[in-house]
């Protein structure tokens, strides 16, 4: 439970010197988050980047969301790790900007 908060009154008022204007009894904070990427979909399989890739969807019995991670390149493009790995078997470039692919990070 949050502690009571003292609130200063404006210096020009004389109403109730020393009294609190209000007291916070309870505060329920809410926070939201989002990935810091512009594109929400994997450009290779077209699924949402936070959903399973098409390979994991086909093998849903054995796949978990922990296994289907996101991979970022130094170009800041993001793909499912399985999708970009399959792509890199034939071409060593980013599918979106054609620059040489280099992993920046991967994982959730």
Curated annotation (Swiss-Prot):
Cellular compartments annotated: Cytoplasm; Nucleus
Entry binding sites for Zn(2+) 3: 75, 77, 94, 97
Enzyme superclass (EC): transferase
EC number(s) per entry: 2.3.2.27, 2.3.2.32
Residues recorded as bearing N-acetylmethionine in the entry: 1
CDD domains from the UniProt entry: mRING-H2-C3H2C2D_RBX1
Pfam families: zf-rbx1
GO biological process, one term: T cell activation
Mutagenesis or variant effect for residue 75 to A: Strong reduction in ligase activity
MF GO annotations: cullin family protein binding; molecular adaptor activity; NEDD8 ligase activity; NEDD8 transferase activity; protein-containing complex binding; RNA polymerase II-specific DNA-binding transcription factor binding; ubiquitin protein ligase activity; ubiquitin protein ligase binding
Residues recorded as bearing Phosphothreonine in the entry: 9
Binding site for Zn(2+) 1: 42, 45, 80, 83
Pathway the protein contributes to: Protein modification; protein ubiquitination; Protein modification; protein neddylation
Modification sites for N-acetylalanine: 2
Zinc finger annotations (RING-type) as residue ranges: 53-98
Keywords per UniProt: Acetylation, Cytoplasm, DNA damage, DNA repair, Host-virus interaction, Metal-binding, Nucleus, Phosphoprotein, Transferase, Ubl conjugation pathway, Zinc, Zinc-finger
Amino acids binding Zn(2+) 2: 53, 56, 68, 82
Cellular component terms (Gene Ontology): Cul2-RING ubiquitin ligase complex; Cul3-RING ubiquitin ligase complex; Cul4-RING E3 ubiquitin ligase complex; Cul4A-RING E3 ubiquitin ligase complex; Cul4B-RING E3 ubiquitin ligase complex; Cul5-RING ubiquitin ligase complex; Cul7-RING ubiquitin ligase complex; cullin-RING ubiquitin ligase complex
Effect of mutating residue 91 to E: Impairs UBE2R2 activation by neddylated Cul2-RING(FEM1C) complex
Domains: entry comment: The RING-type zinc finger domain is essential for ubiquitin ligase activity. It coordinates an additional third zinc ion.
Function: E3 ubiquitin ligase component of multiple cullin-RING-based E3 ubiquitin-protein ligase (CRLs) complexes which mediate the ubiquitination and subsequent proteasomal degradation of target proteins, including proteins involved in cell cycle progression, signal transduction, transcription and transcription-coupled nucleotide excision repair. CRLs complexes and ARIH1 collaborate in tandem to mediate ubiquitination of target proteins, ARIH1 mediating addition of the first ubiquitin on CRLs targets.
Name under which the protein is recorded: E3 ubiquitin-protein ligase RBX1
Naturally occurring in which organism (per UniProt): Homo sapiens (Human)
Higher taxonomy: Eukaryota, Metazoa, Chordata, Craniata, Vertebrata
């Amino acid at each position: 439970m949050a502690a009571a908060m003292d609130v200063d009154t404006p210096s020009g008022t004389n109403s109730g010197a020393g009294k609190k204007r209000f007291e916070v009894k309870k505060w329920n904070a809410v926070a939201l988050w989002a990935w810091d990427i512009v594109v929400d979909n994997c450009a290779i399989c077209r699924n949402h980047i936070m959903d399973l890739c098409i390979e994991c969807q086909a093998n849903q019995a054995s796949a978990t969301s922990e296994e289907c991670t996101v991979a970022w390149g130094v170009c800041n493009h993001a793909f499912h790790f399985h999708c970009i790995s399959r792509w890199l078997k034939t071409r060593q470039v980013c599918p979106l900007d054609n620059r040489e692919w280099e992993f920046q990070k991967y994982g959730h």
